[in-house]
Amino acid sequence: MSEEIAKLTTVQNYRLVDLIGDFAGEELFLIDGDSLIFHILAKDSQFLAKNGVQILYAIYLLEKELARFKSARLNFCIVFFKNWEALYSQYDGILHASLLLFRRVAIRHLRKHVPVYVFKSLGDSQWSIFIAKHRPYGFMVLDSNQNTKEGGLVISDEQVMVFKSFIFFALSDGVPVALLGSYQFVDNKILVCILPSFFTRSSESVENASNLISDYLKKFGKPRQSIELPDIAVDACPSNASRIQTLSAAWLLLNEKSDLNVDLCKILIILTCMLEELSLNDRFQPAFPLYEDPAIQKFIISYLNATNTILQLLDSKVDGFHDIFDGRLFIRLVVDAALGEFCIPDICRESALSLWKLILDIAPDAGDLFDFPSLSSISKDLCVPIETPVSEIDISLTAYNDPVISPYYDTEEWNLEQREEPGIETVLDFSKLRINDKTMTSKRFDDLSATRKTGDNTKDRKQANKVRRQDQFFISHIQKYASSLTGAKGGQLKRQTIFTQGPNSTKESKQAVKEETSVKNSPKGKNTKNGKAEKEKPGKKSKAPKLSKAEQIRAEIAARKVEKEENKNEVIWNETKNDLGRIKDLNLRAGRLAQLLNTRTYDPYIENEMRLYRIRVLLSLWTACCVTDEGKEKNIKIAVEIFREISIVYPNPITKQVKAALDETLTALGFENVIRKMKKLESKPLSFPFVLPDLEDEEFDLEVPYTSPTFQLLHFGEYMERSMGSAPDSRVAFDPDEWQRETLDILDRDESVFVVAPTSSGKTFISFYAMEKVLRDNDDGVVIYVAPTKALVNQLSAEVYARFNKHYPHAGQTVWSVYTRDYRINNPTNCQVLITVPHVLQSMLLQPALANAWCPKIRRIIFDEIHCIGQMEDGLVEEQLLLLAPCPIVALSATVGNPQEFQVWLSALQRAHSYPIHLIVHEHRYSDLRKFVYGGAKEFNGLQEEGDLGQIAFIHPAAAMSFSDGSTTNLAFEPRDCLQLYYAMKLVSKGDFKISRKLDPDRYFEDIPFIKKVDAVGYEKKIKATIDTWASLPNAFAPNSPFQALIKHFCSEPQKVVNSQLELHNSAYSLDAISQNLLPMLKDLHSKELLPAICFNYDRQECEYLAEIVFKTLVEKEREWRENSEEWKEKMREYKKWQSTANQRAKQMEKFEKSATEKQKEQALKEAGDISWIEFFDPEEPSPEFSFAGAKSTYGKEELYRDLEALRRRQAVPEWYVDALYRGIGIHHSGLNRRYRQIVEVLFRCGQLTVVIATRTLSLGINMPCRTVVFLGDSLQLNALNFHQAAGRAGRRGFDLLGHVGFLGVPLHKIYRLLTTKLWDIQGQFPLTTSLVLQLSQLISGSQAGPFARDTIHALMDEPKFMANGSILSNQVNHHLRFVIEYLRREGLLDVYGNPINLASLTMHLYYTEPSNYAFMNLLKAGVFHKIAEKFATEKFEAMRDTVVILCHLFGRIRMNEQYVMTLEGSTDLAQSTVVLPPLPTEIADVLDAHDQRVLDLYKTYAWYYQKHGNIGVAANKLPLSNTTIEGSAKLPSSLSVGVMSEFCGLAGYNESMVGTTSSFLDKVPDGIFLKTSRLPIFEANKAPYNAYLLDFFTHGSVDMLIEQNNLKQSEIWFVLNDFSLVLATICSCLGNLLNLVTDEDIENAMSALEGSNAVQATTESEATGADWMQNMNGNYSTTLASPELEEKMDMNLFKVYCMFLEVRNQFDAKFRKMWA
């Protein structure tokens, strides 16, 4: 069992995820307290043993770790198990005693500040109740003992197995586990490796794990510290809990009355008082050899054990033990007493004497407190202090005179001591390198390939033609993509030509604008200002304006047109009635009418008549259903349709005759209470008789079996009128809601806006209105749309193309441009709407060449899906963009948990540019979402089967309340949910669990004839308030309470589905079970008209696997059906017969065409109608019974064939992917070919595809409206954020009035948690990276400190709150910036005036790899690669392998689990793979270590300056989490200085000279000093084992081996390899620029200078960076220089390095291309 547990809980690679942003959100996480203690002490435990017993310092470290969790907003609690004390019994002496005391003090102390729970064991019933009530989202447990640092606590394998067994316990119980061994804290994010829970909960496995833990704890034995205290000692306990030492000393005196014991007890009493009165800064004492004396050690152990026992006896509420003992100060006092130099502050002396009196009452012969006769015999050698190393901090700074940044720093204050200009030790000859060329340093990597010139005009023309063809093809593709897009109401987008309205517009533009304005001034748009109706002033009559002759003529013509249109509508309606009368099938007649009403706009009177006519038809259908009550219930949808038509017509202006007909219908339905009186109705006879159908049997009636309110809530919720203050507005082509009009007003004022509104609520129009406004203002302004994904970029480019057209006076200017890393269409600096991604926009804003010319033109930046700022990878860049934005912004999101807080931060940013930002929050979706769970399906045999194959159980939101402590805050209720909840509460209510009669629907809605959505929302709030009251009652969670009965009632149906699934499969959640249920579920959705559907699975391979299963099952079932179906066989016989007579028919038709009359031809066409299906029949096409292809697809058949076969010829995807498209099934994830993905999007919108299986790529704003969303299987990525994003695709506005969200293979507890989890807060990162500072310096330098550069720096430096929702103040940022500049100066990347120099360009172009870019720069400077290049000619592969090993340590690192690495030792299964990356050679690691040491020295200076300027802002004597102050002001002359370290670290004897690494130093600086490890360019080489996947791929090129041996996921391989390929391309490109290799001819000349017999392959730079992976050129050269002129001109040693890198890239990319080709 233990071996199985070890295997299941030991991961190979630590794949880190953002614990909060990507997983837990605000859900409760349970932290094992003992795991946390061991994790902290594994770094350093000397302060609990050899370095003195420092309980306060241990508490400080514990609080500091927990404070990090708090700052990251982790919702956590800590649990301890009493029997786990046995874990500490493996240790001896002082360490054992201090560990146990620390554990007990920690529990007691933390309980006051964070939730801490203590249970007897895992078998404790209270533990089970706790888990059942709180349902933690995950556990955090220690998993490894390999992170122990030198001096840290040694953790045995047996102890680790206890923790691993606990991990197994949690996983078996369905709870994921975060592994503490992988934990990192980056900025304010917790990065950790998470083990997903097992698919099926196993009570047997849970019990086995619990028993195994008990067995291990028994092996460890019981704690060896328990003692018995005399009653007198307990009685003598002082009321002041902080003086517990008094009681301990009394026990020690009574237990063993030796002279030494008596004197040490006196010291203990004095120590007690000194801990209360002494300042924390004066407690840094040197260490003494006396501490190791056995007698002293024995006394301390006895004291610690006594104290631990006494703490057990005290009330748990008594606090104040965090500073219970100071071992170093205790020894100091003993030494002073032994030397006769005992001197303590007077205040301590007085309080000590009062305590000593209590002792004398117990032990009268104890003597004088300040007399220590036995201590005088202590050897003087033991009293000599151990020397504490002290080092001076270099406080000098280099000169810095940047014209923009320097003014922010006071010269006298900062230049305390001038540092000499830094000298750079390097093998590079900078005099021969192109380092000061502004055009070169200002180039971003995205544009580097464009700087290469071939020197051949023919090649230039060919390349230009190729680019032109690509652009034309892209435009053609955009046109097709755009034609599939639809607007908010489901109609195709209409392209409008924009005319400039500004002062510089042309005469033609002004005339066009005037005409356009007159068109807009229709009755709908008149008398409005900013969307609000203008009121006429009272007492004044508006005069009709005097019209000119021409205007009178135009008015008459318009009136005649209106009259003609009205007459035309009447004619059409009369013809339509005649056509409808010929349709015998009433269902078809009603459907035809609905179609007519949806396709065009009619005169209001005629529309009323059409709807009344449809009511008459529906009443006939309803009559046929009313012969039984079952018939009414079964066909209630007909009554819903009748009521829907009435609800549309009734509020409109109607005639007496129409109202009479409606009232008669309402009376027949039993809804008399809906009828309302109306005055002054016009009279106009109906054009048809309206008579209610007669019932054959008088026993029956047409009444609906519900009251009107009940009927509307239960069945009419999706049809309720749902506008939220809608009103006409001339600015847009629809009636915007109130919040939308408010947004338009803000945009018109050129102010910023942050909009948070659910998916499908109508956010999209904001972006397009902002674009249109900029387009209309002038021809120069630019609006930028920033999309988080390239898929969204593609869609937006098509949508902008479909919406806007504009003619420009100058050639080359375009409306829009797309610019991503992959491609660019149109000129991004010569367009008005730029659509891009964060990295590219950041690149453009920081380009000096654009700073003065293009950046000032930016009028607005639109950030869609702004919540992505919280993501670990791209969020940092997006946060930097918000800081850099020089204009008003639009920020849009549907999923922000803290909009008010985030808006405050955005306001601060925009305030620097004088742009106010407004928050718009809209809480309600346009369409409700109905959730269901599916399972227990039978075998699929075709879509024609009747009945359901599986079970669908709809999930009532109340079922999820057990996972939210009964809160309904985050639950959304449909109207029918509210109704069901009311009656269920009424059923179980009793005692305190009451429900008001006012909530009875018939009473609540009695005065509301037609319930609107806003009315239902009000009712929802009140019903939720009642259930929240129930949940807050003391006995709400008791097993038999009404509240629990209510939850069980709603949980029963979904549980039945899960149970039925378990009866058919061993697991309801396995991939096999999902694959067997998926096709039956799709069939059932098809029969219920709930397609199209998007099925989300968060694993790419599983998406493809499930799609393949569906497709192949359809094909196989179709084959079986065709073989056995007589219907199909008969159809084939007819088809073959028809084919055999094709020639004969053709001849007859030709003869008939020549001789027949027109009448004969018409008759022939009618007779041929019955067999026309044969003409379109193709036996090769999928049968409709086995295809999900939409019957109403707008994609032409020939066009579909052409496009899909073109896709097949490109071999972009496997053939079955294309065949599946024919059957209406698609796949969508970011790893697929872009052309395939886009055709999937187009076909889905056009209705050809009705099933798409996708990852989260489709959840971020992609316009693919669907009726149903289904989640296939559980995943760590299926969190609240992704759930809300994906579920929002269902029921999109303009398409469906109700969306459906299904779950297949997702555990019920996970479903309920998703429904109740609050969207978490946006957590930003600290965006001022070292590379960004370097880029800003380049911006200032390259733009000659232009206005844009100055404004950018001003916004950064003057911003009071710098990090999203953080607390970084401006002075902290200024300090950080100055020392980043100091680092860049010392590393030779900036000169004294802030200009980038030397290797700055290379470092900047690798900015996305920070801090690895600085490590690479240092290795290049130090000649590491030069040395390897020396053997490149003779030992080519070895040289390349050495290079790749170094690069693998720098880029794309995946940390491995040390325990797993140990299992690989001696393995014979890894012959072709290295798996574990070899450590860097010592001489290379030394280069990186020397760099880290320079950084450490620099930031010691930083800490000194920070403290000197008094900007810490946090009291040095406060604990970081509890804010507990260590009181005291008394001084002690013998204390040492802690320097820049935290005063708490001084307790353990640390100062700045005693820390060896930067990360260790950062852990020990005062809490108020702003220093972030993640933002310092430290590397820490050979820190941990890393996966050698890049080296292995370079060696064997096998993807399968990467999966099998390196344990990489197939879905991530392409991306990590592509990232490394990009790094190689960047390095090669930058080295080529440094060498001034501008043209291919330059490279060839350089290579020809290297001649010899040793052949070495190389690749020209233009080819290496080509987008189409051109054929590589081979060149032969040796290391012998042949041209002295070239040697003088070029750094030939660096050129050898360049050639080596080109070859490394060549060989890596060759394998990489083979992998993805």
Curated annotation (Swiss-Prot):
ATP binds at residues 757-764. Its EC number is 3.6.4.-. Residues 494-506 have a biased composition (Polar residues). One of its GO terms (molecular function) is nucleic acid binding. A motif (DEAH box) lies at residues 864-867. It is found in: Cytoplasm. Residues 507-518 have a biased composition (Basic and acidic residues). Residues 446-468, 494-550 are annotated as: Disordered. This is Uncharacterized helicase C694.02. It comes from Schizosaccharomyces pombe (strain 972 / ATCC 24843) (Fission yeast).
